[in-house]
Amino acid sequence: FRVNNATLETEDHPQYIDVIKVLLNTPLAPGAQTEITTPFHVKLPKHFSRGGHVGQSYQATQWYPKPAVYDSKGWHPMPYLDQGEFYSEFGTYDVRITVPIEYVVAATGELQSAEEKQWMRERIQNTEFRIQNSEAASQKPKFLKPTPKKPAPKTPVKKSTNKAPLKSKKNVAKPAEAESKPAEPAIAAKPNATVIATKTLQFKQDRIHDFAWFADKRFVVDYDTVKLASGRVIEAWSFYPQKDTLWKHSVAMAKDAIHFRSKLIGEYPYNVVSVVQTKESGGMEYPTITNIGIMPDAKTLDMVIEHEVGHNWFYGILASNERDHPWMDEGINSYYGNRYVAWKYPEKRKRNWLESKIPENQTKLNVAIFAKEKKDQPISTASADFTEQNYAIIAYGKTSLWMKRMEEQVGQARFDSCMQLYYEQWKFKHPQPEDFQRVMEQNSGQNLTELFHDLHTQGAIQDYVGPKKIKPAFLYSMKDYERVNYVNFLPAMGYNMYDKFMVGLVLHNVSMPSHTFQFMLAPLYATGSKQFNGIGTLGYHWNPRKHFQNIDLSVTGARFSTMEGVDSNGAKVHGGFHKIVPALRFTFKNRSLLSTVEKWIEWKTYLIGEKGFNYVMDHDDSVSYPTPGVVKNRYLNQLTFNITDYRKLYPYDAQIQLQQGDGFYRAQATGHYYFNYAKGGGMQVRAFVAKFGYLGARTSEKVSRSFLYQPKLTAVRGDEDYTYSNYFIGRSEFDGVASQQIMMRDGGLKLRTDLFAGLQGRSDNWVASMNFNTTLPKNLFPVDLPVRIFADVGTYADAWKKNAETSRFLYVAGLQVSLFKDLLNVYAPIFYSKEFRDNLKTAPEVNTFGKRLSFSFDIHRLNLRKIIQR
C-alpha cells in the first residue's frame, strides 16, 4: 500500500486473515483526502458462497480490498462471512474490465461504451445469436489466431472516497482518455504467445459502497427503460446464459420492483438496474445489480428479483451495518417483499391437500416452533451470533412480522410516510437502530418504546392466547395451531415372523410447535398370533430457559411375539414380551445456541415380562411339543450420560452407561469419531469397553441368570437384545435370512458365530474393541458408491488367561454396504482371525459367502419428534 509513492506500514489482524491495518504516514484530518494505491491479484476459485467461476462463467464478488467504515462508533473491520453480510463506505467507482471480445459483462454501475451497449442490444434481437450462445460454456472463444489458453481477465479498479480510495497501479486510463472513446477491441499478447482479441469496458458509479461484475459469453441480454414518477428514465438490463422461458419476463419483473419500491419508500437514485442469472447462486444483491440462481417457477423468480432489487434501498442506499444489525436490511426488506406479493398476487393460490394442513403464514409458524423449543434468538442479534436457522427465521421472517405489527399500530398511510422520511433523511448516511426509532416516533407521533423493546426479546408473535379446541386430523395438521390441539390419526402396519402382518392405527399429537404433553399410541392387530400388540409413549416435554434445554418425563410400552410353535393338537402357540419403560431425561443448555454440542443424562427402568414355552412330551409319538409358559418378569435400571458434537468436521459422540439388574451390574463406554477426508468421505472410528460384575458373591445361579447381559465381542443377535430396543424381523431365528440380522452393540465384530459359543468373546469380566469403517477413495469411481471397508478388532478378559480358547485379539474385516442414510447396513466379512476360519471349516453348511453375510436395520435410531422439528 502506498501514498504519494511512499510505502505504508501494515499490521496483520490478530484474528482475521482477510483484514489488514494500513498505517498512514501522516494523520488524515476530518474533511481531508488521501489516495492509497496497491496492486492486487485475485484467482477466482470454483464457485462457492457468493462468487467464483462455473466453467467459463465468472462471478467476481468481494474481489478487491475495501476500506473499513469509520463512523461514530469507531472502525468496523469485518472478515468475510458466508452468513452475515457487509458494511462498507460510500464512494465513486471507476472500473475497467478487460475480457476476451466475445464475453458479455454485467456489472455494477453505468457502462460507458455506447458501442458495447449497441452490441448487447443486437444480441436481444438476433435469434440466431441467442441459439448459438445458449450452448455449453465449453465453446472456445474467437481468436485472431489458434490458441490453447487464454489469460485471466484483467480488472483495474478505482474508488474515490473521502476516507481511503483504492485503485490499481496498473492499466488505469485517465478519465478523459477513457471517456473520449467507446470500447474497442484490443490485442493482448506476450512474446511468443498466442494473440487473443480482447476489449476493455469501463463502468462508473457514484454513491455506492461495493462493486460486482459477471462475465459469460453465453449471456442472452434483455433491455428496457423505466420511467420513474419524477420523469427520470433509467435503464433495466437482464442477463441470462440460456433461453429460459421464466427469464423472458425478468426485465418486466425488475421494472415492477423499481416502481413499487420507489413509490413506497423513495425514488431509486441510480440510472441503471440489472439482474443476472448465475447457476450456483440463490440470490445476492450488489449496488445496481443482483445475481439470482435458477428458480422453479415465474412467481418465485419474480419474488426473488423483487427482494434482491429491493436491497438497493436498505443495503445499498441507507447502508446500515447489517453485519451487526441484519434486521435493518434483510428484515425490513422482507416486509416490503410481503407487501409486493400481496399487491401483485392478490388472488390466493389454490393449495394442495398437504399444504392445507399448515397455516398460510409459515413465517409465523416457524417463529413459534423455535420459540417453543427456546431455540429462538432476539431480532437484534448480530449476524455472526445467529444460528443458521434463526438467521432466516428471525432476521428475515420475524422482523417482517414485527414491521407489520408497527404498520398496524401506526396505520399504513402514516407508516409509509414515516418510512419515506427515514429514507430521505438517512440515505447514504449509515443509520443506526436508534436513528430508525427516532424517525418513526417523531413522525408517527407515537411512543414506540415497547415495540422497539421487542427487538431484544425472544418468543413467538401471537395473535391469540386462550383455551384451545380439540379436533381430529388425518395424518397431521398445524393449520390453526394457535386455537386448536389436533389429535392426529393414520393407518399403521408392522411385520415380524411370529405375528406376521399387523394392522392398526397411530394416534398422536406430535406436532409443531411441540406440546408440553405428547403421546403416540399404535395399537396393532397381529394376523399371525391373533392378538393385539403395539407400541406407545406418553410424555411431558419442558423447555426451561435456565440450566436445561429440555426436560422429558415419559413412559413407553411395547408388546410383540418373539417365538412361534405348534402344539400337539396342531395349533399355533406364541411366546413374546411386553415392557413398560419410565424415563427421565435432562438435556443440558449450551451457553450459545451456535454450539453444535448436545449433552444429556437419562434414567430408565425397564420392566419386562417374557413368556416362553414349556415343552411336554406326547406319549403317542415321543415328541416334545411347546405349550405356553408363564410370564417371567425382570427389571433393569439404566443411567446414561451422552455427549455429541454435530460439527461438520470431525463430529463425535461419547456415551457412558451404567446398568443394574438382579444380582449384577454392567458399566460401559462407547465413543464414535468421524475423520473427514480432504476430498470427501471419511473414516468412522468406534471404541467400546465394558465391565461386568456381580452384586455379592459370584455363584453359578447368578452366572446363569445374568448370561444374557454379559458383553461379548461378536455380533449381537435378536435374542440377545435384552431391552428389546431394536427391531428384528425374526428375533429368535437360528437359520434363514432373518437369522442373519444383527445389532451394533458391545464389541461389534461383524461375524456371526452362532454355532461356536467359545468364539463369541463373551465375558463376565471385561470386553474391549475398536471398529473402523471407511468410504472408498473418491477418485477411484466416477460416482459415489454406498460401499465401505470395515475392520473390527477386540479382546476380552478370558483371552488373557492361560490356555485360553482364542488368541488375545480377534479381528474381522470386509465390505459394508450402507443404504438409506445408514439405516440399513449389509456386512460381508472377508478376512478374519484364524480361530474363526478353522471353526467355520468344520461347519460347511454355514461357511458360504451368503451365509456369512449379516445386516443391521437401525430403525430404532429414528426419533419422530426430532425429525419433525428438523
What are these regions (language model features)?
Residues F428-P431, A492-L505, V510-T516, L521-G534, ...:
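Solvent-exposed loop/turn segments connecting transmembrane beta-strands
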Residues V817, K821-D822, V846-R870:
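Outer-membrane beta-barrel "beta-signal"
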Residues P491-M493, N533-I535, G539, N550-V573, ...:
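C-terminal outer-membrane beta-barrel translocator/porin domains of Gram-negative envelope proteins
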Residues P67-W75, Q83-N126, S138-E306, Y335:
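Hydrophobic helix-coil surface modules that form long, contiguous segments used
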Residues I20, K167-S168, K174-A176, F203, ...:
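Hydrophobic alpha-helical and helix-loop surface patches within well-folded domains
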Residues F40, P491-Y495, L505, L521-Y525, ...:
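Transmembrane beta-barrel strands of outer-membrane/channel proteins
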Residues F1-Q56, P175, P182, A186-A189, ...:
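A surface-exposed beta-strand-loop module
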Residues T449-H547, S592-T596, N614-Y650, T753-W766, ...:
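Outer-membrane beta-barrel initiation region
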